Amino acid sequence: MTPVRPLRLLAYAVLPLEVVLVGCLIGGVRIPAVVLGVAEVLVAGLLLAEGLVYLRLRRRGLSRRDAVAELVPEPVLRLVGHELRLLASLGRWVARRPHGTAGADGVFPHARDQAALMYGFAFVCAVETVGMSFLLARWPVVHGIVLVLDVYTVLFVLGLHAASATRPHVLAGDVLRLRQAAHVDLRIPLDRIASVRRETLFSHEKADGELNLAVGAQTSVTVELTAPVDAPRLLGAPRPVRVVRVHADDPQALYRAVDEALTRARTAPSPDPGPPPRV
């Protein structure tokens, strides 16, 4: 057995215990110093062991990304990566720097129809933050923790919209890239597309093999594939799809661009095979 599996099992036991202890301390529960000391030693030992195994994996030739992937479960990595992408999207949104559009043949924003709803959510969260600050003013520890959580909630909601605003659908070369916020990034080769059509839908029933990237509860372009393409879920579970429905601020432009790209790809002349070999 490699040392990675025991470390993961230890982390699953130690980290929840640490969370419970923190919750007890916040709630005013008196915990013996011995218990706190043992918990801190376990956490420090776990971090030290993780660091040593990481160095060992690096010496075996693994890249930084691969070494971290060996130590940390994929769902945890994907969740952390998602949160980091949301925070990075806020910076891109302020700087007006869209993601993944360099060298694109077509860029198709899709966040306009959700903007009012997301701003409304952010406003409600901000009001709730102010209200909780007044209600918890007598309990400074609880007030501080709830304030951090509330502020992060506001940033999270704004980050969701910022991720959609800075990650448009992109047509580049022979690949159609369809995205939603920071959790869906689907690359479809044009030779996998059977058909594309302009189709506005406001209700979507869940079905195997279908992916609906609705914005404002609507989709406006439907892409059917000749073979399944994997669209991993948030935690990494595979999700093969053969029908993808998306929305764009200008759906006609997206439909026209994809349709024209398909026509060019299918009518392109075959390469010259060259002269026959001499016998």
Predicted segments with their positions:
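N-terminal membrane-targeting/pre-transmembrane regions
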Residues: 1-8, 52-138, 273, 278
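Alpha-helical membrane-embedding segments
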Residues: 66-80, 96-103, 174-189, 203-214
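Non-transmembrane, membrane-adjacent beta-strand/coil modules in membrane-associated proteins
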Residues: 181-245
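Conserved beta-hairpin
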Residues: 57, 152-197
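Terminal and domain-flanking low-complexity segments
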Residues: 15-22, 37-90, 223-279
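Juxtamembrane/interfacial segments around transmembrane helices
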Residues: 61-68, 88-94, 167-179, 196-205, ...
